[in-house]
Amino acid sequence: MIKVGVVGATGYAGAELVRLLSRHPKVELTMLTSQTYAGKPMWEVFPHLYGIVDNTLEELNIPKLVANCDVIFTALPHGHAMPIAQEVMKKSKRLIDLGADFRLKDVNIYQAWYKTEHTAQLLLNNAVYGLPELYREIIKQSVIVANPGCYPTSVILGLAPLLTNEMVDTKTLIIDAKSGVSGAGRGLSLKTHFSETTNNFQAYGVATHRHTPEIEQELALLAGNPVTVSFTPHLTPMIRGILSTIYASLINNVTTEELTAIYRQFYQGERFVRVLPAGMYPTTKGVAGSNHCDISVTVDVRTKRVIVLSAIDNLIKGAAGQAVQNLNVMLGLPEDTALDFAGIYP
């Protein structure tokens, strides 16, 4: 059994991670940490785990954590995974970070967007961007995996076939994305108060969202040249889910059916990416509770643009599920281990 620790186990992503790992046949949940609920059983904080997860939550003790665990997941705000990563490297253990500390390769960009000093810069070259559909082979050998952000996951998977096949003008990419409130985290804030979100729909982080440089970095690698995007996220009155609507100008004439075939070829054999038939569009309900990313492409002949729709569950494929998928890749296990389920409906 692989001894696993989860740091930040009582955030939304952390709790989903614990739930998924509890059903993993090769994992022993060895240590769960929580700054807020240390000393309490996990099931007392999350009653849906009663009789399933018996661990008592602990305060973070990095030497103890690294000594007792083979693989560590960090589900923490940015800036907090760096000291853990340094100890992981010293002790030859493995880390999957659900935060932003190791996603951006340019430390100056990280510090500009996150307003935080990067104290583990030497480890950036050791970190692998954890999108298995694109980086599976290098994830297998990695020590530090930077689990992608939720918005970037939906956007990058949505655009990858177009950029690798050089089918769109990379200067015209517009991303209009909507997320459920759980994407804002479990901490209290006025913005996510029930009275503020119910029956409301609002943009936020307009032209300033921190996922922007992550999206641009990965799209540029796919395109082979710098990419700049216009990215506007929105907060919707639902609990979970992301729907990204992406617009790009086509370079050559192509039909919806031809593009759909190109996408299916690109994602052939991928367990968690579902390319929908022409005329069928993704919904957040269609992926809720699953590790799937549903994608459709439509050619607007009149404007010579392609419209890509990409839907994920922000807490699963956008966070915890993708982290477990990365664990499976690292261990050489089937990628759907502990993830082999459809979503919940209705």
UniProtKB/Swiss-Prot annotation:
Does Transport count among this protein's keywords? no
Q: Which UniProt keywords apply?
A: Amino-acid biosynthesis, Arginine biosynthesis, Cytoplasm, NADP, Oxidoreductase
Family matches, as InterPro entries = AGPR_AS, AGPR_type-1, NAD(P)-bd_dom_sf, NAGSA_dehydrogenase, Semialdehyde_DH_NAD-bd
Pfam families linked to this entry: Semialdhyde_dh, Semialdhyde_dhC_1
- Domain of life according to the entry: Bacteria
Could you confirm whether the keyword Cytoplasm appears in this record? yes
Q: Which GO terms describe its cellular component?
A: cytoplasm
Q: GO molecular function of the protein, one example?
A: N-acetyl-gamma-glutamyl-phosphate reductase activity
Residues the record marks as active site: 150
Q: Which reaction does it catalyse?
A: N-acetyl-L-glutamate 5-semialdehyde + phosphate + NADP(+) = N-acetyl-L-glutamyl 5-phosphate + NADPH + H(+)
Cell compartments where the protein resides: Cytoplasm
Matching NCBIfam families, A to Z? argC
Q: Could you tell me what this protein does?
A: Catalyzes the NADPH-dependent reduction of N-acetyl-5-glutamyl phosphate to yield N-acetyl-L-glutamate 5-semialdehyde.
Similarity comment text for this entry: Belongs to the NAGSA dehydrogenase family. Type 1 subfamily.
**Name of the protein:** N-acetyl-gamma-glutamyl-phosphate reductase
- Organism listed in the record: Desulforamulus reducens (strain ATCC BAA-1160 / DSM 100696 / MI-1) (Desulfotomaculum reducens)
